[in-house]
């Protein structure tokens, strides 16, 4: 049965005992409202580690001034039930006051990796992500931590953070989990109307178009961006906010493609902003 831990002190006590006994810890940090994408990461951890910890913590530092922290969905009982079904050992669900007992004396600034794509639209967001992930890594001390490739920019930033701060954890990127028709699974999908849900499948289809262009030898980013944009404009009613090609994981905008790339999409429907991406090319 999955155990619910609600304080930093108790979590640290469990971790210290686990480390003394040589137990491996897998960790999946989340903000709750869990879906199959999260559960895929939990299953991967359970199959690899002695203990799997899932954190459920809505982090106030990654919400901007126009983003409603209080309105973010919270469903800890349901989340606990879901992760129990796939074998998680611990859900770590601390209070905000326990993670941030006072004003932070040191600000973490991500830098250029956060100045593009989602980070450019949400200033300070990735600073908040890195701050809380640093804290959670120090509390849970995982051997392996699992992040979804759906948030590819976040994954690249966390990998850089681990390298720069010498965290003794291996980051495992998990492929995007999709519905049967290709739509990337997301807690935001419930906000789509029936018509928007039918249209939303074209995000993934447009990425497959981009992949086909690349495989056919196209290396001009503008050509790929234009073709993807044209496809989306003819298939969806939502507002296209972004079609971009960046190197990965360096996140440098590409004009002529020479290596591994990350093609990113963002579309705003009436009540949901959806993102999707594909990573193409050899590592």
Swiss-Prot record:
It comes from Staphylococcus aureus (strain JH9). This is Pantothenate synthetase. Homodimer. It catalyses: (R)-pantoate + beta-alanine + ATP = (R)-pantothenate + AMP + diphosphate + H(+). Belongs to the pantothenate synthetase family. Beta-alanine binds at residue 62. Keywords: ATP-binding, Cytoplasm, Ligase, Nucleotide-binding, Pantothenate biosynthesis. The active site is at 38 (proton donor).
């Amino acid at each position: 049965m999955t155990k619910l831990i609600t304080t930093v002190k108790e979590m640290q006590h469990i971790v210290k005992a686990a480390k003394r006994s040589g137990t491996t810890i897998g960790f999946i940090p989340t903000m709750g409202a869990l879906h199959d994408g999260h559960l895929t990461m939990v299953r991967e951890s359970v199959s690899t580690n002695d203990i799997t910890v899932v954190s459920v913590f809505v982090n106030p530092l990654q919400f901007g001034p126009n983003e409603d922290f209080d309105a973010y969905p919270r469903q800890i009982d349901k989340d606990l039930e879901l992760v129990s079904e796939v074998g998680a050992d611990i859900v770590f669900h601390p209070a905000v006051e326990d993670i941030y007992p006072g004003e932070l004396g040191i600000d973490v600034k991500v830098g250029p990796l956060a100045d593009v794509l989602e980070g450019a639209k949400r200033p300070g967001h990735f600073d908040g992500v890195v701050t809380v992930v640093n804290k959670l890594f120090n509390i849970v001390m995982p051997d392996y931590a699992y992040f979804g490739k759906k948030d590819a920019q976040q994954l690249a930033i966390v990998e850089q953070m681990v390298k720069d701060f010498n965290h003794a954890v291996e980051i495992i990127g998990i492929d995007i989990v999709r519905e049967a028709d290709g739509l990337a699974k997301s807690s935001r999908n419930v906000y789509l109307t029936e018509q928007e849900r039918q249209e939303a499948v074209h995000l993934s289809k447009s990425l497959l178009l981009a992949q086909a262009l690349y495989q056919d030898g196209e290396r001009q980013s503008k050509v790929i961006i234009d073709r993807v944009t044209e496809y989306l404009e003819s298939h969806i009613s939502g507002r296209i906010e972004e079609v971009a090609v960046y190197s990965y994981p360096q996140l440098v905008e590409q004009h002529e493609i020479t290596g591994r790339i990350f093609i990113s999409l963002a579309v705003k429907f009436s009540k949901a902003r959806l993102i999707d991406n594909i990573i193409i090319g050899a590592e």
